[in-house]
Amino acid sequence: MNPGGEQTIMEQPAQQQQQQQQQQQQQQQQAAVPQQPLDPLTQSTAETWLSIASLAETLGDGDRAAMAYDATLQFNPSSAKALTSLAHLYRSRDMFQRAAELYERALLVNPELSDVWATLGHCYLMLDDLQRAYNAYQQALYHLSNPNVPKLWHGIGILYDRYGSLDYAEEAFAKVLELDPHFEKANEIYFRLGIIYKHQGKWSQALECFRYILPQPPAPLQEWDIWFQLGSVLESMGEWQGAKEAYEHVLAQNQHHAKVLQQLGCLYGMSNVQFYDPQKALDYLLKSLEADPSDATTWYHLGRVHMIRTDYTAAYDAFQQAVNRDSRNPIFWCSIGVLYYQISQYRDALDAYTRAIRLNPYISEVWYDLGTLYETCNNQLSDALDAYKQAARLDVNNVHIRERLEALTKQLENPGNINKSNGAPTNASPAPPPVILQPTLQPNDQGNPLNTRISAQSANATASMVQQQHPAQQTPINSSATMYSNGASPQLQAQAQAQAQAQAQAQAQAQAQAQAQAQAQAQAQAQAQAQAQAQAHAQAQAQAQAQAQAQAQAQAQQQQQQQQQQQQQQQQQQQQQQQQQQQQQQQLQPLPRQQLQQKGVSVQMLNPQQGQPYITQPTVIQAHQLQPFSTQAMEHPQSSQLPPQQQQLQSVQHPQQLQGQPQAQAPQPLIQHNVEQNVLPQKRYMEGAIHTLVDAAVSSSTHTENNTKSPRQPTHAIPTQAPATGITNAEPQVKKQKLNSPNSNINKLVNTATSIEENAKSEVSNQSPAVVESNTNNTSQEEKPVKANSIPSVIGAQEPPQEASPAEEATKAASVSPSTKPLNTEPESSSVQPTVSSESSTTKANDQSTAETIELSTATVPAEASPVEDEVRQHSKEENGTTEASAPSTEEAEPAASRDAEKQQDETAATTITVIKPTLETMETVKEEAKMREEEQTSQEKSPQENTLPRENVVRQVEEDENYDD
């Protein structure tokens, strides 16, 4: 070869990079100038360390050699030999980045080192920095006096192979083998040439290359890699049996080779081979997916095997997996169209074929399948003919396409035979073509995967292969470059430069985009941080507010608790004061011996704890007294909020309740009612021989008062307030009562009592069970006060004793809500029955009948009793003087209310119209009882607890009235 020709060819690329070289040289000189002066001692020390490093490297001690080279560079940083030798050590250990840095430093010291430029290009090639590798190789060719260096061309061939310029790579590798047939990397070069020939379709040359290196494969590769390449080439040549045997050799050495399993599955799934076995094909493909589930080609072949086995659902799933991994593969979409065609989904098949044609319009099988679809679906023969013609143009040698095109052309030329021939082609064409023509796409599938497998699987292999290339770089070979003599080098260089520039631009754009993305991300992060901080501040503020609210609530709760405690303390103090007052009054008014003997029950009445049957009731009363200001004060206005019927009942039965009355004295009547319950049994035992109406009246009134003390009173705080007003208004009213009508009221009371005695016997049997029922149903009557009041038979039998005894019922009615009367009736009968057990049934009947008539007379007209009571109480007070002035006002007010009520009943005839004359027994009984009541009155007139107990005093008033009449 002409060296002059080589120089003329090299002039053009040299001229293009002269300026760059000059700039680099200037920089190198500037960098080298300050490092030149070294004192002799330093220089000699550096040389000594360099000698030590060379000796260690000769002995094979790389670590000590590297340490010595580092020491040399400390004393002489510009030692080119130390830099290059240390770089060679790093490159031998695959430390290409560190080696490249040292090579660059050596080139700054001496840019004329062509061998260093070549090795630097190889380092950049291993680092996948193709642009810098290309520039380094250019500098090596420029500085070399003889460019015929096999290692240099070996590196250039790898560079072109990485670029994808297979023709230039083939020329570079061929030049290496021409320069040195026994090149140390010859087997690697043959392997690379075999791959290049396979991609170029040069099957025989590829087989020669692979068979040549089969006994001794390149260092990073193994024998089964060569067998795999042989099988791939044989399969591409159509030698199915040889390909199967080659793949089986691979499986003998590597049972988990995913690509080999994939290819074997594809071979066993082909219907035109002798060893056709869909089940084996399925097994091999499933094993391949176990080894590498990310391979889209394996999923594609699996789908085709499922189609052969008519498992269309599994085939669809497999094709879906393949498309998910490689959505731009037209072969996948063609097979999906065939699947839709076989399950008669023609519209979907048309969409799949259309997409495959858009991705690659140069696949003949897709056009053939599209023609079959047109011909079968809607008998679109003209469209089918166009599709067949396009398929025939793309694949002239395809027999199926040519036969189908000829048959369809004959049909169109003979329109009369279209109907006859229409059935045959349509029946024959749809099934075979999609299945038969698809295997022809396999070579296209199997061309590129090998390169990708080698580049991905043997990255370290290529590095090791390149490492073995460079030790021989120092041995120049004097030979001519055939590539330059043929004139291929300028074109190669121009293309390489264009590609390098394009890559540089792409890299610059990518870097700019990366920077922009980084900035955008930084801004987004800053915004996110700001938002997070704002949210944190907001949360902190919300927490602070919540804490403040919680503290405020806690303080409010504490204040409420303190207020409640204060109220409770006040209530306790008031109760203590009341108890002290009661004790003082008891001490100031000692009873005489006769009164204590006759009325020992009244003493027990003030101390209810002495009587065992009544121990529990005072405790209940005290429990209700703990909240006199809260519950009763709140319940007072609730009486006006009741339904109209209940309000009418309240106004009729309790006329005095509508007048404003204080609430502080509410607990008093509860205790006093308890007291009178204890009075009744002892009266019966003291006067067991007397069967009078007064005893029945007293017993019923005491039971009524006991019922007012029942749990219904806490729910109605208003009734407990009425006795307080009765205390203040009773004394002037008693005198008026006696002055106005002393005789008429007594006569009416006695007449009524005698009439009830006659009718009592017939009613006793009916009244007692009613009373028992009312006792058992106390809770239900408490909830329904209106109903209980609407039953006159039961109420009349139970409530009259309150008013048959002196007219206490007028004021008691004001102190008892509508819901308390049914309760009064229930315990009345229950308490009367055990206390009167020693008496005869006649006494019970008289008592109950008297109570019944008096209750009816007083309950109907209570509203008009208040003015009459005032007059009667005033007259009675004048006559009785000192004795009656000290008596409780409520005890004197109730007889007046009963008399006035009876008077008005006679006038209006609303409830009962009975006029019966009194008997002698009744008159005597009234007199005796009046004496007893007078004695009790003197002992209880000043005590606050007895202000609401008018039963016995009323009896005494009745006796006094009778004596006055006599």
From Swiss-Prot:
The modification Phosphothreonine is found at residue 475. Residues 467-682 are annotated as: Prion domain (PrD). It comes from the Eukaryota. Residues 412-429, 439-489, 699-713, 759-780, 814-823, 844-860, 940-950 have a biased composition (Polar residues). PROSITE patterns: TPR, TPR_REGION. Pfam families: TPR_1 (PF00515), TPR_16 (PF13432), TPR_7 (PF13176). Associates with TUP1 to form the CYC8-TUP1 (or TUP1-SSN6) corepressor complex that is composed of 4 copies of TUP1 and one copy of CYC8. Interacts with MATALPHA2, CTI6, MIG1, TUP1, SUT1, RFX1, PGD1, HOS1, HOS2 and RPD3. Belongs to the CYC8/SSN6 family. Acts as a component of the CYC8-TUP1 corepressor complex which is involved in the repression of many genes in a wide variety of physiological processes including heme-regulated and catabolite repressed genes. May also be involved in the derepression of at least some target genes. The complex is recruited to target genes by interaction with DNA-bound transcriptional repressors, like MATALPHA2, MIG1, RFX1 and SKO1. This is General transcriptional corepressor CYC8. It comes from Saccharomyces cerevisiae (strain ATCC 204508 / S288c). The gene is CYC8.
